[in-house]
From Swiss-Prot:
Organism: Dechloromonas aromatica (strain RCB)
SUPFAM superfamilies: Nucleic acid-binding proteins (SSF50249)
Compartments where located: Cytoplasm
Protein name per Swiss-Prot or TrEMBL: Translation initiation factor IF-1 2
Listed GO CC annotations: cytosol
Gene name of this polypeptide: infA2
Keyword Disulfide bond: no
Binding partners and assembly: Component of the 30S ribosomal translation pre-initiation complex which assembles on the 30S ribosome in the order IF-2 and IF-3, IF-1 and N-formylmethionyl-tRNA(fMet); mRNA recruitment can occur at any time during PIC assembly.
Length: 87
């Protein structure tokens, strides 16, 4: 299947499931099970409950998806006076 056939949607992570799977609610209210893409696993990108993500869906099975991007929101500015750990 070519990449042009994939549907790209936005959603919010509702629940973290075993084996790097997540229950995600799409913007249209549809709920599905999604897994992280290989590059996200390779780069150790963490996904938490409440994160906004971009998903790829197959037009043949809309109940499963692949998370390809985690949108970063401002979670507060880091404290510049905080001491860093030295290893």
């Amino acid at each position: 299947m070519a990449k042009e056939e994939l549907l790209e949607m936005q959603g919010v992570v509702n629940d973290v499931l075993p084996d790097t799977r997540f229950r995600v609610t799409l913007e249209n209210g549809h709920e599905l099970i999604a897994y992280t893409s290989g590059k996200m696993k390779k780069n150790h990108i963490r996904i938490l409950v409440g994160d906004k993500v971009t998903l790829e869906l197959s037009p043949y099975d809309l109940s499963k998806g692949r998370i390809t991007f985690r949108h970063i929101e401002n979670r507060g500015t880091p404290n510049p006076q905080a001491q860093r750990r030295r290893y």
